[in-house]
Amino acid sequence: MLRIMISSLILAMGLVFCQAGQVDASAPAVSLFGDGIVAETGEGPIWDPVTSRLLWVDIEGHRVLVSDPESGNTEVHEVPAAPGTVVPSKDGEWIVALKDGIYSYREADRTIRKVAVPDDLTDAVRFNDGKCDPRGRFWVGTVDTVRYADPIAALYRLEGSAVTRVLGGVTISNGIAWAPDGTRMYYIDTPTRKVVAYDYNLETGELCKGVDAILIPEGWGDPDGCTIDSEGMLWVALWGGYAVSRWNPETGECLQRISLPVKHVTAMAFGGDDLDTMFITTAKASWAGLDEPDAGKLFVCRPGVKGLKAHLFDPVDKGTP
């Protein structure tokens, strides 16, 4: 009980620091990515360390997007259903979570094949954000697409071709990230307005002892995607909050906010040769009726800290020679 009280006090102190307006000092300049491609709902950015390109998705546009910083151009790959996220695989293909299942996509000939479908997947949900752990397991969650308010979604783990339901009672599964040493997993179910930190068993891929690490203050927007930096600090995109934010997951303290000229900020990823460039995805969200000419575009900045190399999916089934 004492530990809980102390943790709550530290977390509250972190929120006071955020609300005191001390987090926008020396904010880096934010600019648009080269070709200015627009996504209805840009999401799931991840830097492919093999090809030195950024992979991301346009959910409503049914597209996987590949942005090359060298040329400033973006290649478009259409997929048959709404993609929630994409991650590169060790075999050179991409793992793409579509509405109705998890697929492997081959860039060379633009072919797609189904890898796994959870037994409990229904038409009332679709796959959303996801990432791989340091051992190459793919973690991905679903979202309630009927009211975006009911806890009917779940979080899954894909190992090889075997998919396992890990958490239930989820509403809008979003950001997932691991501490640099892989012993903690950070997870966001957006309506809860918090980041939960789980002790993580790297050998088995099991979660235990989840604790509230970060609470997003009212009026800041809702927590969406997240990523970790080389110092172990967690970055959280603020949907409806015009910003991305950097937090200390041990204290709950907000360290920095980077403002953007669009309301619906969805996710961010570190990339570039030195992993010192941040790529930030946004949503056009036409239904919102906002006058934002740059909404849905990809933004870039140099936040002053480096990221970590992305974990690739391991397609080999456990126990397979």
Enumerate the language-model features and the residues they cover.
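Bacterial N-terminal signal peptides
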Residues: 5-17
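A short helix->beta-strand "capping" segment at the edge of beta-propeller domains
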Residues: 23-39, 68-69, 210-211, 304
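Conserved beta-strand positions in repeat-built beta-propeller and related beta-rich domains
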Residues: 47-49, 54-59, 95-100, 138-146, ...
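A short loop-to-beta-strand structural motif that recurs across blades of beta-propeller domains
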Residues: 63-65, 101-103, 153-156, 194-196, ...
